[in-house]
Amino acid sequence: MDVLVLIGRILFALLFLGSAVGHFTQTDAMAGYSASKGVPAAKASVLFSGAMLAVGGLSVLLGIWADLGSLILLVFVLPAAALMHAFWKESDPQAKQGEMVHFNKNVALGGASLMLFAFFAHTPELGLTITGPLFHLG
């Protein structure tokens, strides 16, 4: 079971770590996109969200307070879904569909982040982690 959980953590974290790299290597382009969506202080927001993605992703991947890392990712993906992928504001059907896919993906990742938080905070028995949970749910 420990190995399966580790494989799941790796697969989950890779998405966020890859996105963090994009935030740091394509900051100006992402800031322009963020500004077009009405995000205030777009460049600072891109850098801050990149840091959230990196810290949360590494935390889950390495098992260092993975419960906290899961919450950090949750705090990123749910607002990002609403702010960056507001499909209901799109008039072009193709753009609307694309934003809906991204919105739904972020909501699903938020659900997965919440489940990971609960798993990590409920039991220290998930194995192959560097630290135990920061929070304790039971």
Task: Give, region by region, the residue ranges found by the protein language model.
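Extended, low-polarity transmembrane helix blocks
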Residues: M1-A29, S36, P40-A51, V55, ...
